[in-house]
Structures are given as C-alpha cells and as structure tokens.
Amino acid sequence: MTVNARGPEGRTDGAVPEGAGGMKKLAGISLAALGVVFGDIGTSPLYAIRECFHGDYGIAASNANILGVLSLLFWALILIVSLKYLTFIMRADNEGEGGILALTALIIGQSIKKKKDRWVLVSIGLFGASVLLGEAMITPAISVLSATEGLQIIAPAFADMVIPATVVILAGLFLFQHNGTARLGALFGPIILLWFFCLGTLGIIQIIQYPQILEAVMPWYGINFLLNNQLHGFLVLGAVFLAVTGAEALYADMGHFGRRPIRLTWVLFVLPALLLNYFGQGAFLLASPEASSHPFYALVPSWAMIPMVLLATVATVIASQALITGVYSITQQAMQLGYLPRLTVTHTSASHIGQIYVPAANWALMAATIGLVLGFGSSSRLAAAYGASMTTTMLISTILFFFVARDLWKWRPPVLWALVSLFAVVDLSFFGASMSKLFHGAWFPLAVGLLMFTLMNTWKQGRRLLMRQLQDRTLTVDGFLDSLALQEPQRVPGQAVYLTANPDIVPIALLHNLRHNKVLHSEVALFHFSSERVPRVPNSKKVEFVRLKDGFTQVVARYGFLEYPNIRQVLELANALGLNFKPEAISFFLSREKIVADEKTKILPSRKKMFALMARNALSATAYYGLPSGQVIEIGVQVQI
C-alpha cells in the first residue's frame, strides 16, 4: 500500500550524480528504500503461497497445481509490479510525488475541464484513498500475526501465545508513534536487507534440490492451471494476488526516494529474493505437499527457527511502520485538499519535514488493527480482507492512469487501449477473485472505504455550503472599501490580520467587529491561504500581496498538499517583500462558526449532523495556522446549512 509513506532519511528527487560519489549516494538511498518501500511486499512470502493451498479456497498441492500457482505468481509480479507500476504508472508523478491523491490532483488540475468529469474522477480517486485507509488497518494485523504464528510451529504449546503476543507488539508499535522514527529509522534498511537475504537463501537451497520448479516461469503452466481447475482455479487468484500487495507503495513513495533507486532496488535485489523464496517454497511442496499449512517456515532449519521468527516479527513491524506513516501522510493530504477537517499534526523530526504524527489517525488505526486481530484470530482469515482492498486500489490506479496517458501525455488510442486493456484484464481478474470472499472478510476494507469516502465527501460538501452561506452574508472587498469612503469608521492605531477563505470577500469576522465595536485598525491585512494541487510551492511563489486603499492589504499565501500553512513563515516572506507587519504587534481576528441544521438545504439530515460533529471537533484555526493565542480574537457566527 501506501500513499507517501515517509521514511527517516528525508525527501529526495532521485537525481543521483555520476561517479563514485553518485553510486555511493544511490546505494544509500536504495538501502533506505528497502526499509520503507519494500517492507510490505517483502513480508508477503509469509502467507501468499500458504493461502493458495491452505486458505478458504485452497487447492490440492499436486505437482501440476504447484507449478501452475507459481507460474501465476511469477507473472503477477512481472505484469503488475515490474510492468504496470515501475515502467508506466511511476511516470505519472505530480511534481515528483506519487500516490492516488497526488495522481488525482494532477489529473484534475491539468486535464479535466468539465465539471461532471471532474466530480467523477475526484470521487474515484477519493474512494481509492479511502480504501487504502482500510488496507492500512489490515496490513499491520496480518503481517505481525503471520510472523508470530511461527511460535506454534516452534512448539504447539505456544499456540495460545500468538494472539496476545501480536496484540502486545501492535500496541507497543502504536504507543511509540509520538516519539517518531528518526533514530530507529536508520536501522530499517539494514534489517530488511537481512530479511531479503534470508528469503533468497532459504529459497535457493530448495531450488538446488528440485530445479524442475523453475519450469513454472513458463506462462502455459498458469494457463493450464486456470483451464483445468476452472472456477476453483479462478478463486485461487485471490490468494495469488497476496504476493503483489504492497506494489502501490512503490508508487506512493516515489517522491521520497525517486524512481531510479526504487526501480534498481526492485530489479537487482527485491524481485530476485522474492522469486527465489516463492520458488523455494514451491520446490519444498513438490517433495512435501503436507507442509502446505506453513510452507514458509518449512524452509527454515530447526536450529534457525527462533531467530527467523524474531526476524520475521521485526520485518513485519517495520513494514507496518511504513504503512502507519503512510496513513499520516494521506490524512495530511486529505486535510490540505479540503476533504478532512483540521487535525492535530506533530512534526517528530526537526530536520525532516516529512516525519509527522497525527494522534487522531494513530488511535483510530490502533483500535481497528487490534480489533481485527481479535476478531479474525488468524492471518489466514484476514487474507481475504487484505486482497480485496489492494485489488480495488490497483483497479482505480489503472483508471486514473488511463486519463493521464490520454489527456496529459496524448498517447495514440491504439497504444493506450492495448496497454490499459491488459492492465484492466489483470486487475479485474484479481478483483473478481477477491470479491468472491466478500462474506469471508472482503467486506471490511470496502466498508471502511465507503465510510471514509462518505466522511470526506460530507466535509467537502458541508464546507462548500458553509462558504456559500457566509458569502451571502458579506460583501466583496471592492464594495466594502467603497462603502468606507461614504461612511468612514473610527480608526485606531495598530495592525490587524483577518483570515478569509475567499480573497475577494470581506471576512465575516471583520464585518461583525465593525458592527459591534464601530472601529477598524489603521492597517488591515486580509490573509487568504490557498491550497494548491501540487505537493509543494517554492518560497519564491508562496506569498504575494496587493496594497488596497484606506490602509487595507490583500495577502495570498499558497502552499502544497504536503505542506502546512504557518503564519510566521508567511509574515516573514511577506515582510521581505515590503509588507512591514510586526508579528508581535498584530491582532488576529477569526470567526468561529456554529453549525445549525436548515431543512431547506438538500443535504441529508444525517450528513448535516455528521458535518456539524466534524466541525465541532476540528482543530482550531489558532492552532492550525500557528497563531499566537494571546493575540487572537475569535468572533462567533451562527450559520444554517
């Protein structure tokens, strides 16, 4: 999964200089990417093969079926990860950033002009991001659970310890989040490097003994498997797909590590290690089909079982950490794009801006993840839910990619339709197989996606109605300034800043202040923060202001969906351009809206209540914009929607 999961090393554009220094930097970035980007897909060998032969729709571990499953798995990794994501979708970046929301913002901002088309694509992208949140709840649960299940292989008496151990590990992981991962993050890459080395080593030992397993790279083994097993074979695709879960993370983390390090790490190290392990599991099953209930741990010598269970547990925790950080990132993006209310965000690193902590998201994720462990009870039962979330996300990525290639890249229709049709057939096959498990857990990520989509859509629509109501009760800036010339109010010395959602409209707080106090400050600045559909706005383009008449100034501050508006930074940039407002002497005026339901509006009553609840629990503008609380005056406004 994950959209824009942040690692410990800070952002890079992936540009690596030539020479020895460049190669050293490339190696360092690639090692860092191992710990953040590839943790999810790298822990799939714990359960992917097992679910094909031992899951809800597990098939008999005959030689033909083993070769067929491995063939399907091999080509899934090649077509979905290597071809679709690394070759094509990673080209569709939004100023270097990847992920569903970044991709949606790119399409909407640059290519789609019709309002109806924009709404449809925004809804598709928003639902994809919502399903990703459901996946983020499942991934830590299934990953850590699949690792700790090795305890019962060490000794059956440990079986009762699996669930408690998993809950303790997950609870510790979430409770640690507020400390950040700056120090521990340096260990992520080397640990995952060791994990992949062990994967490859365990696999190659078995392949040497049964080299005939390599015949599975031939696609006709997979085709024959589907033809011979028909419906049963199709249903097994849902388990085969588990091998490519985490592919979305390669695209989502592109802005952090760059295309080249991710591609090289995949081709030269990750893909070979995964294939060696999967084929090694297949080779072992050729000789011992009865091991289908635990093929991964069956590869491990008895003397190495305890260290391997510990390493697997640490690897799954690292993979979970990357996804948790990804949830913080997608929450941040949704807030900046106006789909979620303001939430508390803490920066956990003074040197790396991408390292953030969102308490509300953390506690919700913790409750859901531990609830899934307790509710499902095993990684095998969670597998159905996991596959459903990822197939939905990948299908949506294909749809969005189509519009990028058609409208931005102007691809010729024959080439475009041929490629997208290939991706769509693969995606729909896996999606259909995963949906067959709808009542076995696949409903969960879809339910979470629908809930989050409803919340985000409700907030966006509610804010739109709220702004419309406020604009109907105020004046344009030009009209207001003209009215001052007719009836000049008393002016008092000082500087005042009013925050406004629309730079051309007078803030309601200003009108209420003037109506009740009958005075205006001698210098008044109307500050508007504009969220752009790009990841970041350079400082040179972040702030601009216009001097109006009668001591008024209009200030517009632009920031990207990966940035946070900060009043001190904006004032510094504006003062450098000649604004001359003293931060310590400014009075900041804000309006605080009280939402009241109005039967005349078309929005459903339940959604009105939902919006009002979200508005009441949103972080205050004072905290969100970093305003000095001792200089803030809030004016209450009642608004009907």
From Swiss-Prot:
Coiled coil: none
Coarse class of the protein's main subcellular location: membrane
Taxonomic superkingdom: Bacteria
GO MF term set: potassium ion transmembrane transporter activity; symporter activity
Membrane topology: Multi-pass membrane protein
Record keyword Ion transport present: yes
Cellular component GO terms held in the UniProt record: plasma membrane
Compartments, record wording: Cell inner membrane
Catalytic activity: K(+)(in) + H(+)(in) = K(+)(out) + H(+)(out)
Short name of any one Pfam family annotated for the protein: K_trans_C
Transmembrane segments: 29-49, 66-86, 119-139, 156-176, 185-205, 231-251, 266-286, 298-318, 356-376, 384-404, 415-435, 438-458
Alphabetical keyword list: Cell inner membrane, Cell membrane, Ion transport, Membrane, Potassium, Potassium transport, Symport, Transmembrane, Transmembrane helix, Transport
Function: Transport of potassium into the cell. Likely operates as a K(+):H(+) symporter.
PANTHER family listed in its UniProt record: LOW AFFINITY POTASSIUM TRANSPORT SYSTEM PROTEIN KUP (PTHR30540:SF79), OSMOTIC STRESS POTASSIUM TRANSPORTER (PTHR30540)
Family statement drawn from the similarity comment of this UniProt entry: Belongs to the HAK/KUP transporter (TC 2.A.72) family.
Protein name: Probable potassium transport system protein Kup
Origin species: Chlorobium phaeovibrioides (strain DSM 265 / 1930) (Prosthecochloris vibrioformis (strain DSM 265))
Lineage: Bacteria, Pseudomonadati, Chlorobiota, Chlorobiia, Chlorobiales
Gene: kup
